[in-house]
A protein has these predicted regions:
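Membrane-embedded segments
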Residues: 77-159
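Conserved acidic catalytic loop of the alpha/beta-hydrolase fold
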Residues: 150-176
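Short beta-strand/loop motif that positions the catalytic acidic residue
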Residues: 265-267, 272-274, 278
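An N-terminal hydrophobic leader/cap segment in hydrolases
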Residues: 4-9, 14-74
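Short alpha-helix in the alpha/beta-hydrolase fold that links the catalytic acid
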Residues: 114, 259, 268, 282-291
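Catalytic active-site module of serine/aspartate enzymes centered on a nucleophile-bearing elbow/loop
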Residues: 313-331
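Catalytic histidine neighborhood in serine/cysteine hydrolases
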Residues: 291-308
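Hydrolase active-site cap/lid region
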Residues: 192-252
Length: 331
């Protein structure tokens, strides 16, 4: 009997150890991928990649750099972390402003095609943050949009000060009119932001609308899907263990990091974009997001587009959809 109890305890301890090790591996694999260093931190390679994929960016960026108008900006967030962004004022003085949010293991440079859309095509001021742990911002892990939502809210205030309130001339002495536009994890971040801007301490009356492109419903749903797709494993027990470890180590969990719950609180306009061939953030996710979001809202399902490729595959149509939607709310 004593041996049975002893072996049972040892077996349980071994099982717990395996679960904790497996959960810790999954957490590191998800929030500290190698690409955070090799891809997101490599700014020179990011410019080269963007110039090859979007050749129209090269002369535009060169002209901005020559004129000295593609600028760096740094802030310190409420947690004392130093964050970086790129920003460019419009060619003509305006209050129209876009804050553009990148995806998982990307950086501000890798969102310059959307910067081009707003700054070159629409004559908007633009600000492109490096999220925590990405690009030139401080940090060693991805926050999957949840804590990033608070940083992006701070960046919207910074953009409003850069392009609006801090100026004394008649054009820019008022608050800006702002759109927040994100892709992939940046789209999830955008939706998480959307649930805050009309409520409590985070109210941002200068934000007029949102564009989300291929964002996920929640971190839990995204990780559950990837656990199945990459490792053919069910959510239980590994995802539950990683979720608990995330709460202990980082102070948030995969379930609370829900874009779906956030959009339910948002009554500002939102454009939903998703490729119908997306398997990384599967297309099905956009439908409950769209249904949960109160009006006004619009949905564009992009034929044949894989993950985060809607602009690349349909640049003219993408530009026209964004122009038409944003133009209804920012004049």
């Amino acid at each position: 009997m004593k041996k049975t109890i002893k072996y049972s305890i040892l077996g349980l301890a071994a099982l717990c150890t395996v679960l904790l090790c497996g959960g810790d591996y999954m957490l590191g694999y998800s929030l500290k991928p190698d690409d955070l260093v090799s891809r997101s931190r490599n700014i020179a390679a990011s410019y080269d990649f963007m110039y090859e994929r979007y050749p129209e960016l090269h002369p535009w960026v060169d002209s901005l750099m020559t004129a000295g108008v593609l600028k760096d900006f740094y802030i310190e967030n409420d947690r004392g972390e130093t964050l970086h962004a790129l920003y460019v004022a419009a060619a003509h003085p305006t209050l129209k402003t876009a804050v553009i949010v990148h995806g998982y293991t990307d950086n501000a440079v890798r969102m310059l095609m959307i910067g081009y859309l707003y700054n070159k095509e629409m004559d908007f001021n633009i600000l492109l943050p490096d999220l925590y742990g990405h690009g030139m911002s401080e940090g060693n892990h991805a926050q999957m949009g949840w804590k990033d939502r608070l940083d992006v809210l701070q960046w919207t205030e910074t953009a409003d000060e850069l392009f609006g309130r801090r100026h004394t001339d008649s054009v820019a002495s008022r608050s800006t009119e702002m759109v927040v536009h994100g892709i992939s994890m940046g789209a999830a971040t955008t939706m998480m932001v959307s649930g805050e801007v009309e409520h409590g301490q985070y109210q941002q009356p200068f934000i007029k609308c949102f564009v989300e492109d291929c964002g996920y419903t929640s971190v839990w749903d995204e990780f559950r899907g990837e656990l199945k797709a990459q490792f053919n494993l069910p959510a239980f027990p590994l995802l539950h263990t990683a979720n608990w470890l995330c709460r202990q180590e980082y102070g948030w969990d995969f379930l609370e990091a829900s874009a779906l719950e956030q959009v339910k609180k948002c009554t500002l306009p939102m454009l939903f974009i998703h490729g119908d061939a997306d398997t990384f953030v599967p297309t099905w996710m956009v439908y409950p997001l769209y249904e949960a979001k109160p009006e006004p809202k619009e949905l564009w399902i992009v034929p044949g587009a894989t993950h985060a490729m809607s602009y690349k595959d349909y640049p003219q149509e993408y530009t026209e959809h964004v122009k038409k939607f944003v133009g209804k709310y920012i004049h």
